[in-house]
Design a protein with these regions (language model features):
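The feature captures the conserved acid-bearing segment of alpha/beta-hydrolase catalytic domains
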Residues: 330-423
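Glycine-rich nucleophile elbow surrounding the catalytic serine of serine-hydrolase chemistry
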Residues: 306-316
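A domain-start/cap signature at the N-terminus of enzymes
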Residues: 184-235
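Alpha/beta-hydrolase active-site loop
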Residues: 275-295
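Short, surface-exposed "cap/lid" segments of acyl-processing enzymes
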Residues: 220, 225-259
Length: 437
C-alpha cells in the first residue's frame, strides 16, 4: 500500500515538474520571440516583426509596427515626389489611407501633371495645392514654376484684352511679381470700357484739328494719337515737352504727325510737371491706360521721350511706371536735356539709377558732342549698370534735335527692336562704358 502511494506521488511530482518545465519553456520562447521581433523592428523589417507580435497577441507591438511602416512608406513617397517620380509616389500615398497629410500629397502628384498643360483652371488649382505644401522644397519649386506660367498667361490674356480672365489670374497670384499692380490696372481698364461717353477721352467732341489730322484727340492734360486699328501688337509712347512746366508747342505734335509711328498709341503731355514729376508722370500713365482701354488694348511696356527739361520727367518715369503700375519702360529718348545736366535735383539719384538698371531700360541721349561722361548725372547712370548710348546729331541745335526726332522716324525706331542705328546719315551712336576700377 505504501509502495503504491509512493508511486502515485512520484508520478504526480513528475507531471508537475514537466508542466513547470513546459511553462518555463513557453516563457523563454515568448521572450525569445519578443526579442526577435524587437530586433526585426530595429532593422526596419516591420512586416516580419508584425507577424511575430500578432502571433504573440501583442496588440501594442502590432500598432508600433503599423505606425513605423506607414511612416517609412510616407517618407519614401515624399522622396519620390521630390525626385519627380509622381506615379510611384501616388501608389505609395494611396496605400496609406488617411495617414497624416497623404490625401494632400496624393493630390500634389496629380497637380504636378498640370504643369504639362496650358489649362489655366488646372494650373490655378495646382498653385493652391502646392502653396498649402510650402514646407517641401519640391512644392516650393512647383509654386514658382506655376506662378511664372500663370503670370505669362495673364500677360497674354491682357494683350488680347481679355481682362476679366487676366484679372482672375492676377488676383490668384497675389504678391507674385507685379500681379497686384496689374490687377488694379486691369480693373480700372474694365471700368473705363464700361464708362458712359461723357466720361471718355476718345470721343468726337475731343478731336483735334479734325479736318487736317486723323485720329488725334485732346484733353486738358494731353494730346493723343491713336492708330487706325489697335491690336495686341500695338506699341505705346509718351512724350514730355520742355520748359519749366510750360504749355507744349504744338509744333512737336505736328512734326510727329508728318511721319507717325504705325500701330503706336502716343500721348503728348501738354506740360512736363517738372516741379512734381511723380504726380505728372503717373497722370501721363493714367491717361495712356484710359486711352488704351477705350481702344481695347493694354500696355505692359512703353517708350518715353522728353525734350530739354522734359527729359528729366521722362527718365524719372522709368522708376515710377514700374513701381506704381508694373509697366516696364523699354527705352528713353532724352532730346538735348535742358540745363546741361547741371541741376542736381532733376537728375536720377543713385538708388533710382540702380532701379532703372534692374528694369533694363536703355537710355539714348541726343546731345551735343561735348556732353558725355563729363556730366555727373550721366556718369552715375553708366556706373550703376545702365545701358546709355550717346547720340550725336548732325544738326546740333537745341530745338531742331527734338523736331528732327519727332519728324524723322526716331519714335518708330525706338518702339521697334532698334536692331540697326536710326538714320545713320544724321545720327552717330556711341555706347558709354563704366569707369574702370
Amino acid at each position: 500500500m505504501k509502495r503504491r502511494t509512493a508511486i502515485w506521488i512520484g508520478i504526480i511530482a513528475a507531471l508537475v515538474l514537466l508542466g513547470a518545465v513546459a511553462q518555463i519553456f513557453r516563457i523563454c520562447r515568448t521572450d525569445l520571440r519578443r526579442e526577435q521581433a524587437e530586433a526585426l523592428l530595429e532593422a526596419g523589417a516591420y512586416a516580419h516583426a508584425r507577424e511575430i507580435y500578432d502571433g504573440l497577441g501583442d496588440t501594442e507591438g502590432v500598432a508600433r509596427c503599423d505606425a513605423l511602416q506607414a511612416e517609412e512608406v510616407y517618407q519614401e513617397g515624399i522622396q519620390l515626389l521630390q525626385a519627380g517620380d509622381y506615379d510611384s509616389a501616388r501608389q505609395l500615398f494611396s496605400s496609406l489611407g488617411s495617414y497624416k497629410d497623404t490625401a494632400t500629397l496624393l493630390a500634389a502628384c496629380g497637380w504636378q501633371e498640370a504643369l504639362a498643360f496650358e489649362d489655366t483652371g488646372k494650373l490655378t488649382e495646382a498653385l493652391r495645392g502646392f502653396q498649402a505644401l510650402g514646407q517641401y522644397s519640391a512644392c516650393q519649386e512647383a509654386v514658382e514654376q506655376i506662378s511664372e506660367r500663370l503670370f505669362t498667361r495673364a500677360e497674354e490674356l491682357a494683350a488680347a484684352f481679355k481682362l476679366e480672365e487676366a484679372c482672375a489670374i492676377w488676383e490668384e497670384l497675389g504678391s507674385y511679381e507685379s500681379s497686384a499692380l496689374l490687377l488694379q490696372r486691369g480693373r480700372r481698364a474694365l471700368d473705363w470700357t464700361a464708362a458712359p461717353e461723357e466720361q471718355r477721352l476718345l470721343i468726337p467732341a475731343n478731336r483735334y484739328l479734325s479736318k487736317s489730322l486723323k485720329n488725334v484727340y485732346v484733353c486738358d492734360q494731353a494730346y493723343f494719337v491713336i492708330p487706325e486699328e489697335c491690336s495686341s501688337e500695338t506699341r505705346f509712347f509718351i512724350y514730355y515737352p520742355g520748359g519749366r512746366d510750360e504749355e507744349m508747342s504744338v509744333d512737336y505734335l505736328l512734326y510727329y504727325m508728318m511721319n507717325p509711328s504705325p500701330n503706336t498709341l502716343a500721348v503728348f503731355m501738354r506740360k512736363n510737371g517738372l516741379d512734381h514729376m511723380r504726380e505728372n508722370t503717373c497722370q501721363a500713365i493714367d491717361l495712356l491706360d484710359q486711352a488704351a482701354a477705350e481702344c481695347g488694348v493694354f500696355a505692359r511696356e512703353i517708350v518715353v521721350a522728353g525734350s530739354s527739361l522734359g527729359a528729366y520727367p521722362a527718365m524719372h518715369s522709368v522708376v515710377y511706371a514700374c513701381e506704381a503700375y508694373g509697366i516696364r519702360t523699354d527705352c528713353v529718348l532724352s532730346l538735348d536735356a535742358g540745363s546741361d545736366w547741371m541741376e542736381e535735383e532733376l537728375l536720377l539719384d543713385e538708388a533710382e539709377c540702380r532701379k532703372a538698371a534692374r528694369i533694363g531700360t536703355e537710355f539714348y541721349l541726343f546731345e551735343s558732342p561735348w556732353v558725355g561722361m563729363n556730366r555727373e548725372g550721366i556718369r552715375m547712370m553708366v556706373n550703376t549698370g545702365n545701358r546709355v548710348t550717346m547720340v550725336g546729331c548732325t544738326f546740333d541745335d537745341h530745338v531742331r534735335i527734338s523736331l528732327d526726332a519727332m519728324g524723322m522716324g526716331v519714335v518708330d525706331w525706338a518702339v521697334g527692336d532698334r536692331a540697326q542705328p536710326c538714320n545713320p546719315e544724321i545720327y552717330s551712336f556711341t555706347r558709354l562704358e563704366p569707369d574702370v576700377g
